[in-house]
């Protein structure tokens, strides 16, 4: 989860988020280099006393400032396209979780496993225990096994929502009457927090998301408790 005065991205806890962080750093480096180069040329332009009033054209320099930006754009576009395909790629998922946005809470359905369903509401501030996070903790956490490919089916029964967990690299719109699909694979055990990322009404700020990634044996025990 994010920390106070944090300026960077959250630590990546899924292969997808790790790739997104790498691409962010790659693109940011290119932007910094371009900004520095343009700033240098602007400073040089305003500080020198030479005039070029009689320079009508320059084929060489025009070729350079056309070809080099094209190469830079391709260097940014290729990893971006690769990431877009990785986000959509879901191959033989071990589990499918259906997420439905309501006004204003989330419900989860494990239809592969005896049709387990439950609602997840934010815990009010006056009911929080020590160690809980205000506006982030819920009464029912969604559990999933770590290091397993999971398919998420996300929709809404009312207004537009967006199911987002930044540290897992997931942000998917929940649209009424439509199923959107995303993939999830968690690297390590832990509790990961997110929130609705689409302004959806008066309860928008009170729709937290909590994903708890556990080992396979612990996940099976949790399933037994849900079934019983």
From Swiss-Prot:
Residues that hold Cu cation A2 according to the record: 196, 198, 200, 204
Any one of the GO BP annotations: ATP synthesis coupled electron transport
Entries under Pfam families matching the protein: COX2, COX2_TM
Disulfide feature: none
Subunit structure, interactors included: Component of the cytochrome c oxidase (complex IV, CIV), a multisubunit enzyme composed of a catalytic core of 3 subunits and several supernumerary subunits. The complex exists as a monomer or a dimer and forms supercomplexes (SCs) in the inner mitochondrial membrane with ubiquinol-cytochrome c oxidoreductase (cytochrome b-c1 complex, complex III, CIII).
Family: Belongs to the cytochrome c oxidase subunit 2 family.
Record's protein name: Cytochrome c oxidase subunit 2
UniProt source species: Artemia franciscana (Brine shrimp)
């Amino acid at each position: 989860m994010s920390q106070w005065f944090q300026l960077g991205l959250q630590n990546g806890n899924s292969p997808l988020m790790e790739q997104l962080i790498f691409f962010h750093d790659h693109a940011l480096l290119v932007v910094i280099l371009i900004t520095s180069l343009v700033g240098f040329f602007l400073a040089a332009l305003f500080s020198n006393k030479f005039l070029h009033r009689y320079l009508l054209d320059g084929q060489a320099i025009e070729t350079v400032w056309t070809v080099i930006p094209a190469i830079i754009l391709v260097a940014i576009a290729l990893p971006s396209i690769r990431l877009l395909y990785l986000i959509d790629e879901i191959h033989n998922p071990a589990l499918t979780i259906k997420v439905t946005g309501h006004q204003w809470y989330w419900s989860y359905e494990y239809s592969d496993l005896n049709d387990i369903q439950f609602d997840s509401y934010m815990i009010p501030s006056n009911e929080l225990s020590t160690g809980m996070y205000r506006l982030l903790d819920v009464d029912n956490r969604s559990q999933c096994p770590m290091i397993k490919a999971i398919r998420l089916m996300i929709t809404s029964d009312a207004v537009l929502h967006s199911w987002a967990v930044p540290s897992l690299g997931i942000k998917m719109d929940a649209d009424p009457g439509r199923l959107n699909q995303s993939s999830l694979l968690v690297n390590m055990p832990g509790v990961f927090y997110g929130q609705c990322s689409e302004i959806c009404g008066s309860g928008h700020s009170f729709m937290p998301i909590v994903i708890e990634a556990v080992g396979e044996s612990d996940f099976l025990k949790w399933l037994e408790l849900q079934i019983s």
